[in-house]
C-alpha cells in the first residue's frame, strides 16, 4: 500500500495567513495523523507527499493575494525537509503545467505530466 498526500496551491492564499513553514507544519501533522491510524496492520505506513508546482512570477489576483508567488516557492523545500524528518517519500511536481486562468490548477497536460512522474516513482516505492 502507498498513501499519497498532495496539498494544493490554495494553501498559499493570503487569507489563510500561512507561510511556507506553516503549510509544511500542516503537512507534518497530516503525516503524523496518518501514522497513528490503526489500519496499517502493525506496519509503518508507506507515505508519499507531493509538493505542488510553484506559482509563476508576476501572478497576482484578488483571490490569492500578495505574496502567493514567494510563499509557493518555499513549500517544496519545506515538504522535502519534512519528508526526510518523518521517513516518508517526497515528489516535487514542479514543471507540471498550470492553466493560464488561475495559475493554480493543472491543465490536462499538467495532469498528464504529474501522472507520468507518479507512474515512474510509485512502482519503486511498493
Residue spans for each PLM region:
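Alpha-helical cap/lid subdomain in secreted, periplasmic
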Residues: 1-126
Amino acid at each position: 500500500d502507498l498513501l499519497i498526500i498532495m496539498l494544493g496551491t490554495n494553501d498559499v492564499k493570503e487569507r489563510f495567513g500561512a507561510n511556507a513553514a506553516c503549510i509544511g507544519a500542516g503537512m507534518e501533522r497530516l503525516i503524523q495523523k496518518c501514522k497513528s491510524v490503526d489500519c496499517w496492520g502493525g506496519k509503518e505506513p508507506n507515505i508519499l507527499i507531493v509538493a505542488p508546482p510553484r506559482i509563476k512570477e508576476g501572478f497576482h489576483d484578488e483571490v490569492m493575494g500578495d505574496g502567493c508567488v514567494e510563499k509557493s516557492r518555499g513549500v517544496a523545500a519545506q515538504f522535502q525537509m519534512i519528508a526526510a524528518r518523518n521517513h516518508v517519500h517526497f515528489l516535487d511536481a514542479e514543471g507540471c503545467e498550470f492553466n493560464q486562468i488561475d495559475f493554480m490548477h493543472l491543465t490536462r497536460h499538467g495532469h498528464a505530466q504529474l501522472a507520468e512522474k507518479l507512474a515512474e516513482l510509485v512502482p519503486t516505492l511498493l
